[in-house]
Amino acid sequence: ANLLILQVSYAQKSSELVIGGDECNINEHRFLAFTYSRGFFCGGTLINQEWVLTATHCDRIFMRIYLGLHNQSVRYDDQQIRYPKEKYFFPCSKNFTKWDKDIMLIRLDRPVKNSEHIAPLSLPSNPPSVGSVCRVMGWGTITAPNDTYPDVPHCANINLFNYTVCRGAYKGLPATSRTLCAGVLQGGIDTCVGDSGGPLICNGQFQGIVFWGGDPCAQPRKPALYTKVFDHLHWILSIIAGNTTATCPP
């Protein structure tokens, strides 16, 4: 499987790119962050002026976070670069397995300003519904198994399935999980290496974080797993509110 990380050939999508998509509209990803560290990159989501939500497996010692980026070869006047001031990792063990905790909150070294190309994406108010059409995006590879990385982010629509679909596709998954299963059953469209940490947006709400998938990406009947943002809301909001010792949901 593919963790979707640029440097890992395991089951995580730390660096997946969208396969089967098209270049994102320049105005549809104002919240999309690009995290970079010595050739390794991931996606992330700006959830307010001071916080970015991404995947734990995207963590690196030296990270530079770009906001307002579209074409990596062209710098917008309002592009902003930040560095992590604090990082928070989901600490819960009770009722959470290793599959449920690939989520990281990054506090930026200074707030970003809303602009033409930068604006946060709200956290979800409700969990997503199976059958929803969801949007994925990132600078991950657009081909598999051989990687091709674009200068611009690609976007695609995929479908949200019952978790049992992913459990049937991959051996070793737990019976239940706080992850979302999404993809296209006929294959050809998927997140992939380089897309890890980026958002899964269902019906306009930020519902998932790119986590794990098949290797190679975009194979038939091999949807990917996304960390379920809604199931981590208590922890996210507690940390942002200043309760840095927040542990598990009640």
Swiss-Prot record:
Entries under Gene3D superfamilies matching the protein: Trypsin-like serine proteases (2.40.10.10)
GO terms assigned for molecular function: serine-type endopeptidase activity; toxin activity
Glycosylation sites (chain numbering): N71, N95, N146, N162, N243
Alphabetical keyword list: Disulfide bond, Glycoprotein, Hemostasis impairing toxin, Hydrolase, Protease, Secreted, Serine protease, Signal, Toxin, Zymogen
Tissue and organ expression note: Expressed by the venom gland.
Compartment(s) of residence: Secreted
Domain of life: Eukaryota
CDD domains, per database record: Tryp_SPc
Cellular component annotations (GO), alphabetically ordered: extracellular region; secretory granule
Peptidase S1 domain boundaries: 18-241
EC class of the enzyme, as a word: hydrolase
Keyword tRNA processing: no
Residues cleaved off as propeptide: 12-17
Active site: H57, D102, S196
EC number: 3.4.21.-
Any Gene Ontology biological process: proteolysis
Assembly information from the UniProt record: Monomer.
Family: Belongs to the peptidase S1 family. Snake venom subfamily.
Protein name: Snake venom serine protease pictobin
Natural source organism: Bothrops pictus
